[in-house]
Regions:
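Transmembrane alpha-helices and adjacent helix-loop boundaries
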Residues: 1-378
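Pre-Walker A (P-loop) beta-loop-beta motif of ABC nucleotide-binding domains
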Residues: 410-421
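Walker A/P-loop
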Residues: 431
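Helix-to-loop junction immediately C-terminal to a conserved catalytic motif
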Residues: 438
Length: 455
């Protein structure tokens, strides 16, 4: 365990040392710009991964948080002369508050409804940034001065090092947070919210906190984005950026800081692939070859179903055909990003880092630690009530959700030494009754509710 920890920490240090040293070996301004974007997208994707990877919610509002953070920093710099460190902190704090206010109503929704709510917020923010000309200069865009640090303007190389330093701080803070009690709560929320509630962890409270945290990191990344490009335009932070960010998290690997950085590199490089017809064609052919090999292998070994094997093959084949047919791939950006996202979600749900971790574990035959021996029944149930004793008694129990009466007028007596079953069709209130009895839901009405000890 200690050896593995040393290797992981050493790899993290090596990553940032190599990234920090690259500008000394790279003289191209274009390459330095890509490295700077990698650091900025890394901060944004670490924040998005909290919601998508750990909370299991499809968050389509991260592009809006980037936009709000960028404009907040830009306005603070142009009107009030705020330097870059304070602007990044203030933008992050502002978007944390905005994220919390959005999460309070939105997280009462689940699945597609939550995704639609966050996507609507992104569209609303883009419209507001475009229409509030007195504040944002509207469609004409907002010019931002060069970033200042302690009163001195930063050149491109110094700004890159600042971005890498911020990424390293975010990495360190998130690594410690995700290994703490809060991080374990985030991870449990994705797998089973009901079990998390049953263990006394406030599901809704932790979801709001996680969403706000991810939004704050998105705002901080937006501030860095503003100072990097020195120009902001409202339509930058719309659907296309939303899909690119989501693609970066999924393709890099969810629930992984390494995956966020890998995804950031892909996000930084992907738009540049579309600008070169030859590069995009080569990328499409390689993606199709990988999908074909993985799909056929999964079908032969029966480790995957036909849909998960064939759908990525069809999607990447469409990309290959498009790369030869389309005269200008830039015109098909949204369709290309959507096909890539579909291929990754279906064919590689664990992402590149998850796939690499699994492959390395198989290669080096890494075995998980042995589980402790099962406890004896006497340890789990040290005492038992005499047969016939009433342990649970309900009378007139009801639980309503608005006008829906999920449970209404239930009478029940559970005695020791007996086994009871709830029988009924879907939607008849079986799970709701168990949740009320276990304390997850408060009863709307009850005449008698008594839970007695077995002793």
């Amino acid at each position: 365990m200690l050896k593995r920890l040393i290797l992981v920490r050493g790899a993290e240090i090596a990553l940032f040392v190599v990234l920090g040293a690259l500008p000394l070996a790279v003289e191209s301004p274009y390459a330095l710009g890509l490295l700077t974007l990698l650091a900025i997208w890394g901060v944004a994707l670490i924040g998005l991964d909290v919601t998508v990877g750990y909370l299991g919610q499809i968050n389509l509002a991260q592009a809006a948080m980037l936009g709000l953070g960028a404009y907040f920093a830009g306005i603070a710099a142009t009107r009030y002369g705020v330097g870059i460190p304070l602007a990044v902190v203030l933008s992050g704090a502002f978007c944390t508050v905005v994220g919390a206010l959005l999460a309070l109503p939105a997280l009462r929704l689940e699945g597609p409804q939550f995704a639609l709510a966050t996507l609507s917020f992104t569209a609303l923010c883009a419209t507001a940034l475009n229409e509030l000309e007195w504040l944002t200069n509207g469609a004409q865009g907002l010019q931002i001065p060069r970033p200042l640090l302690l009163g001195h303007a930063l050149d491109a190389r110094a700004f890159f090092w600042l971005c890498i330093a911020i990424l390293a701080l975010v990495w360190l803070a998130m690594r410690n947070l995700l290994s703490s009690q809060w991080g374990r709560a985030f991870e449990a929320l994705r797998d089973s919210p009901i079990a998390t509630d049953a263990m006394g962890v406030g599901t809704y409270r932790h979801k709001v906190a996680g969403f706000a945290l991810g939004s704050g990191l998105g705002g901080a990344a937006g501030a860095l984005y503003a100072f990097n490009f020195s120009y902001l335009q409202p339509l930058t932070f719309v659907y296309e950026l939303t899909v690119i960010l989501l693609l970066g998290v999924v393709l890099g690997g969810r629930k992984s800081l390494w995956g966020a950085v890998v995804g950031a590199a892909l996000v930084a490089l992907l738009p540049n692939l579309l600008s070169s017809h030859l590069l995009f064609r080569a990328f499409s052919v390689i993606a199709f070859a990988l999908a074909l090999v993985a799909g056929v292998r999964g079908l032969v070994r029966r480790t995957t179903d036909a849909f998960r094997a064939l759908a990525p093959i069809a999607a990447t084949l469409t990309l290959v055909i498009g790369s030869f047919v389309a005269s200008n791939t830039e015109d098909w950006r949204k369709a290309i990003f959507a096909l890539l996202l579909f291929s990754v979600v279906v064919g590689l749900p664990e992402g590149l880092m998850g796939f690499a971790s699994t492959a390395l574990a198989r290669l080096f035959r890494v075995t998980p630690p042995e589980l402790p021996p099962p406890a004896a029944l006497e340890q789990v149930l040290p005492a038992r009530a005499p047969d016939g004793a009433v342990l649970l008694e309900l009378a007139g129990l009801a639980r309503h959700f608005g006008g829906v009466r999920a449970v209404d007028g239930v009478d029940l007596a559970v005695t020791a030494g007996t086994i009871h079953g709830l029988i009924g069709p879907n939607g008849s209130g079986k799970s709701t009754l168990v949740n009320v009895v276990s304390g997850l839901y408060a009863p709307t009405r009850r005449t008698l509710y008594e839970l007695r000890s077995e002793e």
